[in-house]
Amino acid sequence: MKLEHPDRLMNRTPLSLAALETHDAFAERHIGPDAASQQAMLDTLGFASRAALIDAVIPASIRRAETLPLGPFAQPKSEAEALAALRALADKNQVFRSYIGQGYHDTHTPAVILRNVLENPAWYTAYTPYQPEISQGRLEALLNFQQMVADLTGLAISNASLLDEATAAAEAMTLLQRTGKPKSNVFYVADDVLPQTLEVIRTRALPIGIEVKTGPAADAAQANAFGVLLQYPGVNGDVRDYRALTDAIHAAGGHVVVAADLLALTVLTPPGEWGADVAIGNTQRFGVPMGFGGPHAAYLAVRDEFKRQMPGRLVGVTVDAQGKPALRLALQTREQHIRREKATSNVCTAQALLAIMASMYAVYHGPHGLKTIALRVNRIAALLAAGVKQLGFATVNDTFFDTLTIDTGARTAQVHEFAKAKRINLRRVSDTQVGVSVDETTTRDDLADLLDVFAQAAGGTAPAVDALDAGLAGVAALPAGLERTSAYLTHHVFNRHHSETEMLRYLRSLSDKDLALDRSMIPLGSCTMKLNATSEMLPVTWPEFGGIHPFAPAEQTVGYREMIDQLEQMLVAATGYAAVSLQPNAGSQGEYAGLLIIHAYHASRGEGHRDVCLIPASAHGTNPASAHMAGMKVVVVACDAQGNVDIADLKAKAEQHSANLAAIMITYPSTHGVFEQNVREICEIVHAHGGQVYVDGANMNAMVGLTAPGQFGGDVSHLNLHKTFCIPHGGGGPGVGPVAVGAHLAKFLPNQRSTGYARAEDGIGAVSAAPYGSASILPISWMYIAMMGAKNLTAATETAILNANYIAKRLAPHYPVLYSGPGGLVAHECILDLRPIKESSGISVDDVAKRLMDYGFHAPTMSFPVPGTLMVEPTESESQEELDRFIAAMIAIREEIRAVEEGRADREDNPLRHAPHTAAVVTANEWPHAYSREQAAYPVASLGTNKYWPPVGRADNAYGDRNLFCSCVPMSDYA
């Protein structure tokens, strides 16, 4: 029901309970414009109702006839009800003490980081820092991450995170394939690499013709491989000296990738010092909860010669217009949105928020604190080794950092039974061996419990921890010559913020530099920067979700899996497909998985030769990049003057490639913000030639409840839960990219055979390290759908379309709207054409984007899908007041441009060419411009009470790429 004023309710008799219940209250807080505002906007558009507008926008041939079939979630829950229902599911999980290891460890998240980063909307609602001037805070935090990784690995340069350790390993493999031994297609994986990593590597290698060989690390030099992956320490805990082996691999013409534990590298010689070419790994144990598998920030570091081949984001140092240091994303020409099928990777969203947490963990503890944690972990492992030996058990590995593999023989089942009684999980290595990985949360009481488990199995008495500690003067746990001697984290940022006061102020100083959703609307087209409600975010930090290991026994994860099953069914209802997998931990990975599923389907029918993928010229860069990674040949389909798929060209290309046609990849609504009228015909043409239809779900926010790709001809789609379903963007991740498929493709959904969470045997290989990907943020989308219900999800979609059309209508007299459908209407976003302005005034789309910062706004999406344009997506969460504020800013900027066109302002010395204007520039003694300081900083009256100041002037991108520097800069540079 609609909330009404209490005075009006008091005049009713009798007051029923139903009249006072507010199940729809959350929807009214999520959807920005109230009823009066919506009607005012509809009046502007010339429609009597929202329903009439939607009838005019969406083709009748694809309209959904029924209400979203959400079953028990059809009716909205209040925030309290939804939290209680989710709490009931969380309580079904059992949080055991986890010593499983295998790349995931329990950790303490410092409270100051938990509250002021993970739970702070200034950090989690920000977008990827493509506009560097308003992203300096998170860019600095990510630069700290890069410095941390480079220091600890001993390599020259690190990227700003990848999706997980297994994905990073696969990316390292393809990096070396591009740069390594030209006559070899072999990638050699040592047999003590994490099993989930090997599984993802196999998935990624198969479609691009890489042969994966496994075996003892010692045999790697004889494998004739272009690359070798070593684990340091190994999955069984061994710490091996790989110096001679690395030299031998190099002598044979190969390169070496090392999967390294960053905490171990505080005490072990780093890979870069013994010849590694690439290091990869996971930063999860630096303060990020296990979360049933994610999200966590992986890392990839390389020798200097490989820096231009690195996948993922890279933060670099440059200068601004005033010559002061500024940070920006560097070497963007490597990325999929520019190079398309020639990109180094299809990764877009990575794990920025988690990388920031990990970097702040290092800032908080500093080098001394990290080493103390590492030495304590190693000491506990040594005491455990000594204790189990006293009890008659042998350790398989004599060298170790934190992990022991213990030979338990016929008593293995007893060991697990006694451990279970103490709510302890050990790794099930085999029927005769168990693994124990300790971590920073392991206390002396925990150690005593572990010893007691083995004592019970041995029929003896556990040795006392204090006695073991007193009797163990030293232990040869690390190989001779592998103890680290080099310094790390020497930069001042890791050595000055160790009191909570200093740490708190540092975090605040960084967040104050950035413009996120907590300050203003972010109207990025194709990005769906909607509300990330607090009640949706709360469960992320519940220990019942955060404290679960991804490979915990199934009986301990009942609540998690029930929640996941429910969310999958919610997404099935929204998409019209038959089945969903939540394993892909980014949209790019869901897209990749979808293409592999299509290939598996064709292969199952004896048509594995089908490898041609049709992609419209207007498609997002991830589409061709993913198709290339999936082993497909990209054939571009032309678009007509209105931006729609050229049907004649599609028919010709489909006919030409009929025998080998695998798929078409389309986005709907299209990337130009319109519901194409002939989408059913497009699907039918491709199906007639034996192909499958991949519908990119990036624009699903315009479809939920109104139409569904699974109902108008799609066979497979990926979704972006960090767009449509309210997971925040986190400044560049985390994301979740579920893949949804029709019934005929369901059995091919991603598997993970190396764990106890396998799906259908015909499933493609794993695309993420954990069976459910970034599981700990799935409650966000569950909460959103549960609190909205079927009717309000549809209303949200309708309002997103209303808001976009309102902006288009209001701005059309000032900026041409490039594409529209019948009646001049758009879908959930609109493209403003600035190319005529460039011709008439010399003002570029970049100038307008930077000038918007002076008005307190993040720019819309620049030059996509058409160069020289801005794509605006307001989402349903923005109020009419905020839309009007943005419209006023855009109109004011158009008047500033008009002054240039008419000669009233200089073509170079004008507010747009010199934007953004910092406080330092505006208050300087010298003011060299013809326009006033007031026009520079306060061009509209509303800024007088709510002014955001960009911390740096316009970043010099060309300088940054010419003088690539991707490490922390000295304090003197900020003076």
From Swiss-Prot:
Instruction: Spell out the protein name for this chain.
Output: Glycine dehydrogenase (decarboxylating)
Q: Which GO terms describe its biological process?
A: glycine decarboxylation via glycine cleavage system
Q: How does it assemble?
A: The glycine cleavage system is composed of four proteins: P, T, L and H.
Keywords attached to this entry? Oxidoreductase, Pyridoxal phosphate
What is the phylogenetic placement of the source species in the record? Answer: Bacteria, Pseudomonadati, Pseudomonadota, Betaproteobacteria, Burkholderiales
**InterPro entries in alphabetical order:** GcvP, GDC-P_C, GDC-P_N, GDC_P, PyrdxlP-dep_Trfase, PyrdxlP-dep_Trfase_major, PyrdxlP-dep_Trfase_small
As recorded in UniProt, its EC number(s) are 1.4.4.2
Signal peptide (UniProt feature, chain positions): none
Q: Which molecular function GO terms apply here?
A: glycine binding; glycine dehydrogenase (decarboxylating) activity; pyridoxal phosphate binding
Q: Which Gene3D superfamilies match?
A: Aspartate Aminotransferase, domain 1 (3.90.1150.10), Type I PLP-dependent aspartate aminotransferase-like (Major domain) (3.40.640.10)
- Function noted in UniProt: The glycine cleavage system catalyzes the degradation of glycine. The P protein binds the alpha-amino group of glycine through its pyridoxal phosphate cofactor; CO(2) is released and the remaining methylamine moiety is then transferred to the lipoamide cofactor of the H protein.
Reactions it catalyzes: N(6)-[(R)-lipoyl]-L-lysyl-[glycine-cleavage complex H protein] + glycine + H(+) = N(6)-[(R)-S(8)-aminomethyldihydrolipoyl]-L-lysyl-[glycine-cleavage complex H protein] + CO2
Q: Which domain of life is it from?
A: Bacteria
Q: Name one GO cellular component term.
A: glycine cleavage complex
A Pfam family the protein falls into: GcvP2_C
Essential cofactor(s): pyridoxal 5'-phosphate
Q: Which CDD domains match?
A: GDC-P
Enzyme category, top tier = oxidoreductase
List N6-(pyridoxal phosphate)lysine occurrences by residue: 723
